[in-house]
Amino acid sequence: MSMCSSFKALGIAVGILSAPSLVTALQNGVGKLPVMGYNAWNAFECNVNDTLIIQTAQYMKVYGLLDVGYNHVNLDDCWAMKNRSSTGEVVSDTIRFPDMKNLTDQLHALGFYAGIYSDSGWFTCAGYPGSFMYEEQDALTFQSWGFDFLKYDNCAIPFDDVIREGVVGKYQRMADALTVVAEKTGTTFVFSLCQWGWSQVWLWGASMAHSWRIDGDIGPYWSSIASIINSASFITQATNYYGRNDPDMLEIGNGDLTYDEAKTHFTAWALMKAPLLIGTSLASISSQMLSILKNTEIIAINQDPVYGTSISPFRWGINPDWTFNASFPAQYWSGQSENGTVIMLINTLDEPADMFFNLTESPWIRAGRQYAVRDLWTHTSNGTAVRSFTAADVAPHGVVALLLQDAGDEPAGLLPLCAGEASTQCTAENGTKYY
């Protein structure tokens, strides 16, 4: 969110040295798949009211965004009054949000879930009441208003001798409160942590939440997109059903991102199985940017019902593997999907480039097989790949997204006898080695 300071790579470098250990995911009946929807912060910050929120939901229906899966509309910071009531309740702004229950009723009637925002400290990042020491009371208030989703920020942290907890314990307080609310009311919230990647959240986030921020706030420019992709590349193992890395809300339609950069942004977020929260003004979005958000072949990977895991790098490309470089992140990625192996290639250069890989560099490709190639952006079937694939003339900061489907045995008699990594140990049954 909102005013989250830039804590680039804080704790991420530690993660390079040890892969994330998997924790038991919070399987509480909601949040199995990445949330898709809208959050108002990137476009409007504090300049929001209930009319804008409903108008946004209506645009989402008219533009077909609800039809392709964007079914959440979430408030961010600045919806509250600056002071609590005499009995301690948090109070919505009487001018801009005079009736929260009416707002959520309207969103639900339109077919959307409704999301709200709070903070784990004394105040939100914009200076409104935080939920520290009011966790259960606020959670019950949010439930009574009809909300389904809670984004929880990291500002205004109490003194150590007051909180006597680290980041994990601070967020556990609200997780416990949400559990109590579920037991009392039957309402289970999707819980989204906005703790900026602090305290190696990829090791523990899944024990209490459905998503967790891995870095500081995103910006609508390429250097921010590249930096976040770099941070994510080392911790992809943490993502699965019910719990996932969150690289922050989408900036498609904002700032000076080119069309190709916006495609790369969306592709990376979607194929990493991140939440997809639109963050631009839908009243002025271009048809080109809208087409990116509505790419159903990319969305299908994000919402895969069989595999909940993220794509991961199999080769860094420009840099040696495992290089932490915020400007030139990993370029060659792959992952599993219901319908085949997913490949993502990112040209991190400022000029067009050809991008080549051996198929078996991906762990999900079988040796000795050929693969039908589906381009997820041109929506075309592009022949059959045998042993390798080259994407020609990839645009600066551009992306190629492919779905490779097994198409049977490769042609007989191909040399070398073993391709890729296996070539260094290629051995006949009689022990003869072939290099």
Language model features with spans:
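Glycan-recognition surfaces
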Residues: 137, 183-184, 188-281
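Aromatic-lined carbohydrate-binding/catalytic grooves of carbohydrate-active enzymes
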Residues: 56-161
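N-terminal module-boundary/linker segments of secreted carbohydrate-active enzymes
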Residues: 23-54, 59, 178-179, 187-189, ...
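Fungal secretory targeting signals
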Residues: 1-25
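Aromatic-lined carbohydrate-recognition surfaces of secreted/lumenal glycan-active proteins
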Residues: 112-129, 179-201
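Carbohydrate-binding surface patches
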Residues: 269-272, 277-279, 324-364
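Structural recognition of the beta-strand scaffold that forms the well-ordered cores
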Residues: 34-40, 69-76, 113-118, 148-153, ...
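C-terminal beta-strand-rich structural cap/linker in extracellular carbohydrate-active enzymes
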Residues: 383-435
